[in-house]
Design a protein with these regions (language model features):
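General small-molecule cofactor/ligand-binding pocket signal
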Residues: 43, 69-71, 215-217
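N-terminal glycine-rich phosphate-binding loop and ensuing alpha1 helix
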Residues: 1-51
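Conserved beta-loop-beta/alpha segment of the NTase-like Rossmann-fold superfamily
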Residues: 65-143
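Conserved core of the sugar-phosphate nucleotidyltransferase
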Residues: 109-193
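Acidic donor-binding segment of Leloir-type glycosyltransferases
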Residues: 48-69
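Hydrophobic packing residues within well-ordered alpha-helices of enzyme cores
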Residues: 5, 35, 53-57, 185, ...
């Protein structure tokens, strides 16, 4: 709910709506405009300050909002991020042949997201940042070259208890080439998994593929905007 971000703002804001100078500099506007011509529909899942989100899209994104579906997550305050992904997947059009998932607090370059969306494989993204437990989602491949994600919600320490062949900082963008399998994964989540992070769904889907079956796309310019300082760094990059 943007708690780290709002430490640096005069009043509480939804961080994907925060901007300086012009609304076009908000993360949601930047993200949507970068992918707009590459996809058939864009699903935005909100919860915290949902009315602000609706109003911003209606008033500041008129040029693209006809392609948007806006979905309300009524458990944003007591469930983890996985429920937002689950709610988004529920409204994906039946005829969709692939799904690209992007976390809402990211800043990235256009060329990298184009590589993700145009890939002919399932895609895992990585970035060039150091792996720091207080903010990174780490990705490693085990001795058999299957992927595993690790993240500490308390931002304390990360632990790996098995041999691994590679380790990356996740770019927190993924492409699912098999929507039917995504829906199947979601269908068999336990109540506890539904309340967890989005890595529950992501791990169950991608954990079945070896590295050679995936396209690992390195995002050239990448910021996870946890703070206003992160946001400013991204805009000035």
């Amino acid at each position: 709910m943007s708690s780290r971000f709002n430490k640096d703002t005069k009043e509480d804001v939804l961080k994907c709506l925060y901007y300086e100078d012009t609304p076009a500099n908000s993360l949601i506007s930047l993200q949507v405009h970068k992918v707009y011509d590459l996809v058939d529909e864009i699903i935005v899942v909100g919860g915290y300050k949902y009315e602000d989100l609706k109003q911003f899209i209606r008033e500041q994104m008129k040029d693209v909002n006809h392609k948007l579906k806006l979905v309300y997550n009524d458990h944003y305050h007591d469930y983890g991020s996985g429920y937002s992904l689950l709610k988004g997947i529920e409204v994906v059009s039946e005829q969709t042949d692939e799904i690209t998932f992007i976390e809402g607090d990211l800043f990235f370059d256009t060329e990298s997201v184009e590589r993700i969306i145009s890939s002919k494989k399932d895609v895992i993204s990585v970035n060039n940042e150091p792996i720091l437990s207080q903010k990174a989602v780490a990705l490693y491949f085990d001795a058999n070259n299957y992927p595993h994600y690790i993240y500490d919600t308390s931002h304390s320490c990360l632990e790996i208890h098995e041999p691994f062949t590679a380790i990356f900082n996740s770019g927190q963008m993924w492409k699912f080439r098999n929507p039917s399998r995504v829906r199947e994964v979601c269908q068999f989540l336990t109540p506890e998994q539904e309340q967890g992070t989005n890595l529950e769904i992501i791990q169950k889907y991608f954990g079945a593929y070896k590295m050679s079956q995936l396209d690992i796309v390195r995002v050239s310019l990448w910021y996870n905007c946890n703070t206003v300082s992160d946001y400013r760094d991204s805009i000035n990059s």
